[in-house]
Amino acid sequence: MMEYILIFISAIFVNNIVLSQFLGICPFLGVSKKIDTSLGMSAAVAFVLTLATIVTWLVQKYVLDVFGLQYLQTIAFILVIASLVQMVEIVLKKVSPALYQALGIFLPLITTNCAVLGVAILVIQKDFNLLQSVVYAFSTAIGFGLALTVFAGIREQLELVKIPKGMQGMAIVMLSAGLLSLAFMGFSGVDGGLKVLFGLD
């Protein structure tokens, strides 16, 4: 149980997928202008990321490893993720049109979100079992959502203040992203302390 708590805390704060591992930068910068849109994107990513990790883990263990096709991992995972996003989009459109309308614009963007592919590969590299993979994927999605929503809040506040001409646009956005990254660096070493505390070291 403690091992899963460690994975959960580490994935959200210590090794945040965006601010520490620099995956998913495109949606982080592109969909973070408003809190509403960032929450919608976060929900869509959480759903697809968790589902994609389960499917890609099963593909790796029961297809690629069994038939010695590990060299096809990246292309296989990309195809699985793209197919999964399309399937989710079709199902949502039929089952829940309201939810489809809310997330519709974000779902196609998830296919190109490198964080989804990155997490799928990371769980294989870390040799996680299926439950650990699910916990890691969901925790990573929460970490992504947290970073995205906090950053959207910062950008909304920046709209209310007068920024010097030379710092307007992407300059202040990149500076704010850097400061947010530095804030999350304050969590570095927490996972090591928790390992000792939980007796996992």
What are these model-predicted stretches?
Residues M1-I5, L58-Y71, I121-Q132:
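Helix-coil boundary and interhelical linker segments in multi-pass alpha-helical membrane proteins
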Residues E3, A183-D201:
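Juxtamembrane boundary at the C-terminal end of a transmembrane helix
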Residues Y4-L19, G68-S83, V135-A147:
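Structural signature of hydrophobic alpha-helical transmembrane segments
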Residues I7, V14, V45, T50-I54, ...:
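Hydrophobic core segments of alpha-helical transmembrane domains in multi-pass membrane transport
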Residues F22-G30, E89-V95, G104-L107, C114-D127:
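Generic transmembrane alpha-helix signature in multi-pass membrane proteins
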Residues L23-T37, V85-L99, F151-K162:
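C-terminal ends of transmembrane helices
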Residues D36-F47, Y71-F77, L99-I110, P164-A171:
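Cytoplasmic-side transmembrane-helix entry/capping segments in multi-pass membrane proteins
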Residues K61-G104:
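Ordered, amphipathic secondary-structure segments that act as subunit-interaction surfaces
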